[in-house]
């Protein structure tokens, strides 16, 4: 290990980490499974890593890097690497939050109709195909321009991109580095939710912890209705990652790079393979922002239909849009010196502090909004970034609850009807394309998101602003 590993966990979450470690001892590394503790140590041994390998409270085993792992690499160190495993297969999987001027009293009586309207408007599920008309030429433009393409084509409002990480566009994107297979997979999926833990939720403001921050974001009234969309780059992002892993295995053999785990395939940042991946990854990130923008357009249409109004009159503005699977070049202070770092965030969210130049003007006094999605039927949170987090975790915090059970375990141990009945008992309308996903994504499959968020708050790496409660959910 070149640097130490640091875990941000409380006693309850620490117990889950040790359970995962114990499972690994019993079953071995069958199927490539490694516990998060070991994965964090393996990342700490990668060339060019600085400061520490960081595990956030929602950490659990992933591919190469654990999900919930943050690691930064010195751009000026010729040995430093970029690893697709540090971003994940769903590049720029992220969350967008829309506010409305509706209340729970207005939406509650029609939540079933609203859930159905969202389900009808937004294509969901494995293999779902979008209804946004997209040609091969459009795809090239979307990969390069990100949300600027959405704005040009009429699927976004001008102010949407102002409230988006990177303003919805990675400038170093170059579609020439995205394979034809990746483009072919992405073309029919524009504006689709996908499956797994992706969702669109209608939520209400449940508690306000920071009135100033909540007011600045326009979500300061308990009972106010908001919409959360969680999705990523679909098959295109998966193919970009797959293509890069193959190329990087060759680069490792050529350059003599040795890692502790084959899943940590990587390349020197400034190598041909490293730069090709970063350009293709940026295209996939742009695709994901276009995807969430397209679903925002569709969600606005669904609300307008149900409430016989316009999205503008319903005040359906974007509060913020964050990525939690990405690698970006950022300026940070390491050992008292300002350094250019390639920060890998996998299952973790950027959380920049007040006055940082890369956050919108209207959030300068409160810090960057951080959107933390809960599980199906549990609360979600809006946090803000802190100066302490910028110093300790490269301006990063948690992204969600984090799995506590494997998908297979959830399918075997949970009953479909029981999960649905529990959601209905909480007054939540649900539409799901695949029944098995109800078990896989049930609250029992995940850690307690409140424990995760509270741990980050108590550690000072982010600050709680608003708690959100679901009243309608659509899933793939």
Curated annotation (Swiss-Prot):
Binding positions (Mn(2+) 2): 93, 230, 324
Provide the E.C. number(s) assigned to this enzyme. Answer: 6.5.1.8
Instruction: Give the matching SUPFAM superfamilies.
Output: Hypothetical protein PH1602
Look up keyword Cell membrane and say if it applies: no
Keyword ATP-binding included in the entry's annotation: no
Which catalytic residues are annotated?
399
UniProt family annotation: Belongs to the RtcB family.
Name of the featured protein: RNA-splicing ligase RtcB homolog
| Species annotation | Chlamydomonas reinhardtii
